[in-house]
Curated annotation (Swiss-Prot):
It is found in: Secreted, Extracellular space, Apoplast; Secreted, Cell wall. GO terms for molecular function: fructan beta-fructosidase activity. It catalyses: Hydrolysis of terminal, non-reducing (2->1)- and (2->6)-linked beta-D-fructofuranose residues in fructans. This is Beta-fructofuranosidase, insoluble isoenzyme CWINV6. It comes from the Eukaryota. The lineage of its organism: Eukaryota, Viridiplantae, Streptophyta, Embryophyta, Tracheophyta. GO terms for biological process: carbohydrate metabolic process. Its EC number is 3.2.1.80. The gene is CWINV6.
Amino acid sequence: MADVMEQNLLQTAVLNRTSFHFQPQRNWLNDPNAPMYYKGFYHLFYQNNPLAPEFSRTRIIWGHSVSQDMVNWIQLEPALVPSESFDINSCWSGSATILPDGRPVILYTGLDVNNKQQVTVVAEPKDVSDPLLREWVKPKYNPVMVPPSNVPFNCFRDPTEAWKGQDGKWRVLIGAKEKDTEKGMAILYRSDDFVQWTKYPVPLLESEGTGMWECPDFFPVSITGKEGVDTSVNNASVRHVLKASFGGNDCYVIGKYSSETEDFSADYEFTNTSADLRYDHGTFYASKAFFDSVKNRRINWGWVIETDSKEDDFKKGWAGLMTLPREIWMDTSGKKLMQWPIEEINNLRTKSVSLDDCYEFKTGSTFEISGITAAQADVEVTFNLPFLENNPEILDADQVDDATLFDRDSSVGCVYGPFGLLALASSDLSEQTAIFFKVIRRGNGYAVVMCSSEKRSSLRDNIKKSSHGAFLDIDPRHEKISLRCLIDHSIIESYGVGGKTVITSRVYPKLAIGEAAKLYVFNDGENGVIMTSLEAWSMRNAQINSNPTY
């Protein structure tokens, strides 16, 4: 019986493996590192344990893949492996910088021979004429930065991409935590030559109660349009974003930065609460962004962890994947970022279905989206709501806790909803991941909550099943509610209202796999909603590291 159960798990694991998300063929993946474009190829490096599907503090290397469209990838030899006293215990995360002469340089974190102290290391390509950048060398002058006295030896890591100030000096941030406190910080270093680095007297930003800041990012965003700008651009037409990964989330602040005074005036501080702005409200961490000079856009990648058991990961033989690459830009309000899958993802669309006529969903209605491969799909749907009136008898949202608001089975306090999509659902709906909206009263108006519930995502045990949610910055009286979901067997990326809010869910259905998976539109609210448009596509497989060249 045990052998049969294990065989069933392995068969399910094969069908749970994604078909157009980035992941290695086997073993462990975590943080995305040093994405860049160089001589005709996009490069993505990543944290990799080549020996097992688990994290290791002593054998992490840099995996390396290249692509011409950020959709199909070829796996190359590892770029960085532990080899010197300054990184002999692991090559941890870092970033790439393109120097003025066009040469790429990597700054990364080495765990040195001295009690695995975290230090910053420079790596350079051995042959800059090689567009694939297959070989990297580590100059003998390394390491170039070591933990300052007020930072623990193991809380100093993940250098950002460097940028140039008006004085011509290079700047870079290192994620850190203050010794004996929970104050997280981004430590600023400056250099004339990318070799000798000097710590600035005060951090660029710090916040109490957040703990260690991992994988920081710092970059300008245009306030005049959607196009991205180079990381060193700093003028009146941009504001700056500082992102830090802590508490299991990727949070960011927006502010104005001056390289003359090294002052970053953020609109708010990190709080390590739900009040922090997040790239993604689901399973998403340790992201890394870069400026794509080919199409003048800023692209962001995030790591999606497994939420099953370590035992299951060993049986599968793999763990960890990346989100789809997302374009990011400033919302017209200037207060938050927008995100959307890069346009190249659309090239995977094949068979499609659509519904142009309006369709009313009364309470309890369910509508199957048939004619596509529901386990591997891209779907966009738009809803409109009948006229909303101010009704003092409706419960104000401030009286409803988040757990209730994000609960797929609760309509407490809702004017409309829950309504939305049931993805990776079984035919009897015993398995389903619900991506839905609720419209609630708040003050003198209304607010919209977007959620993704994994409570019924799988009949399997030993799987973390969470409910994620966030408020959408729209007024449902004047704007339609739209949703795009990219479904890939065991991951669902959901984008609300053009990318105002994003939620990634990692799920492992037992029944809703392969051809047995279903996709539905539903409305469980007390009031009817109108679906004004629906488009859905089957997605073809991408070539993801299936043809390693070594």
